[in-house]
Amino acid sequence: MQAKAHFAQYLIEQAWAKTLIDGQSHKPWSWADTYPVAKLSIEQAKRPNHFDGPASNDSLYVLAGASGRNLAFGPALVLSSAPAGAQGNTVIAGHRDTHFAMLNGISVGRRLALQTAAGREIVYQVVATQVVHESQTELMAPSEDNRLTLITCYPFDVLQGGAELRFVVQAIPVEPETAAQSEGATVDRTLEPKVA
């Protein structure tokens, strides 16, 4: 499953590059029933000799619709939530053992960047992390304020399914100038599409 999940991100990246060029939705492969709707980057804090997740500032491509099939290929936007870049609560779900394994150890203050299909980059700051029961869905509810909510199963070190707990990260938008000046974090500015 992990190999499929990581390989799919390369195909999704190509579809995303096309979306940024022409503004249209592009399927990553011919039989896909989804398409990328955003690009998510999670910044790594500058802490010497500390490793709290996979590699550097790798970006993840977010698919439309958080179905089980889509989550096998990458994080996915919960369709009942606000679209990336729109007013409201944008909710993205991902598997704890693949793409959202990088949320393990994320802390308040960390910066996230979300690129929309229009090419606009929104920088967010993590304001809360918490573990909740799967029945506590109020964190996914629509809101009038702008926020980004990331959700994955918990605990991270359990590889079998059936988890009743969810790890939730909540972030709010910050001004780009403020984000770039953040002490102890770097901003991933490699959000331009790669065109072959």
Regions picked out by a protein language model, each given a short descriptive name:
Residues 1-196:
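Solvent-exposed, non-transmembrane regions of membrane-associated and secreted proteins
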